[in-house]
């Protein structure tokens, strides 16, 4: 199955969500599924080529190494290139529409 795992987002528990999403993605891949791990807030920003490439992309190391402190959400917002006020990043809805299942690894 093609599964999109949504993690991160804009929550004080963002880092925990990224870590959960990484673990869920790896477990699903071990079971033979095609998995695209996507940060809900940043979406497909920075993805080279079509968003479908995320199904073959390794789990980012940054998703596995989380800090103990809550993230500075103002810094997270400022880091998004398109500066959109939306909580949903570019390409997320389109990627989800093409998946068989969307798994929410969101917290908070």
Model regions and ranges:
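ATP-binding N-terminal substructure of ATP-dependent carboxylate-amine bond-forming enzymes
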Residues: 1-108
């Amino acid at each position: 199955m093609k599964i999109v795992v949504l993690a991160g987002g804009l929550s004080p528990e963002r880092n925990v969500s990224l870590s959960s999403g990484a673990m869920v993605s790896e477990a699903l891949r071990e079971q033979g599924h095609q998995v695209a791990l996507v940060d809900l807030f940043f979406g497909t920003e920075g993805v080279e080529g079509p968003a479908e490439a995320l199904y073959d992309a390794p789990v980012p190391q940054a998703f596995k190494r989380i800090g103990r402190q809550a993230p500075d959400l103002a810094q997270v917002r400022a880091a998004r290139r398109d500066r959109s006020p939306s909580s949903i990043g570019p390409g997320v809805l389109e990627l989800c529409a093409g998946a068989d299942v969307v798994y929410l690894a969101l917290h908070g």
